Regions:
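Extracellular/periplasmic carbohydrate-active domains that bind, remodel
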Residues: 1-219
Length: 219
């Protein structure tokens, strides 16, 4: 496990700002923690300042990420569980500030990808208009519990990786906060390439701050 660390990087002093997929340097050059083939691991009480990518968990089971803070210069990813089962990420906050040309928070918020299942994001504070990230290749059967401050419009993944999420994505007490005055999220539009294509997501206790948000094709 990893406990009680502050991780910093030279991304802070790199002359370019983050632009999504502008080049491999701004996307991936400074990556903090990458776990693969781990069982019963943990990260606790850790801060990340100025990173392209903070935590990625691949081909692992039963890990816990608890009490994590992200801050500093905006980068690509925050948390990602891919090809993994039973990952709990809780009590995390993204404090990366907004700028004139960019939303606050890392480009991708809480993320799931590549057949991951049975993962939980709990008590997560996102920035306004920051998107959760169901990144395709069929993640399914996940819970987002008490996630505050984000939206759904900028999930990652190409058309070849569709849908962004498979069945049984449950969003429990999700508090939506975006820059939209009004928007309808159609989660299964067969005629349009959308970055929020989820198979019948389930919303329980959804609330929205000053937005007129409606859904179509939810569970």
């Amino acid at each position: 496990g990893v406990e009680d660390f502050l991780f910093t990087s030279e991304w802070l002093n790199y002359p370019e700002e983050f632009v999504h997929h502008a080049n491999d340097v701004v996307d991936y050059a400074w990556r903090a923690l990458f776990f693969t083939n781990i069982k019963n691991g943990w990260v606790r009480n850790v801060k990340f300042s100025d990173w392209n990518d903070c935590i990625q968990i691949r081909k692992s089971v039963t890990m816990t990420i608890d009490s994590v803070e992200i801050s500093g210069k905006r980068g690509h990813g925050s948390f990602m569980a891919l090809s993994s089962t039973g990952i709990l990420i809780k009590n995390a906050v993204d404090l990366v500030p907004a700028k004139v040309y960019a939303n606050g928070g890392q480009r991708h918020g809480p993320a799931l990808q590549s057949g991951s299942t049975g993962c939980v994001y709990q008590n997560i504070k996102m920035q306004k208009n920051q998107s959760i990230d169901c990144h395709g290749d069929y993640p399914y059967g996940h819970l987002m519990d008490n996630v505050h401050g984000g939206t759904f419009h900028q999930n990652g993944g190409s058309k070849l990786a569709y849908p962004n999420s498979g069945p049984d994505l449950v969003l429990w007490n999700f508090k939506h906060d975006s820059n939209f005055d009004k928007i309808q999220f159609d989660f299964w539009d067969l005629n349009k390439h959308q970055l929020h294509t989820y198979l019948k997501p389930k919303f329980i206790g959804f609330t929205s701050l000053d937005d007129k948000i409606t859904f179509e094709n939810e569970g």
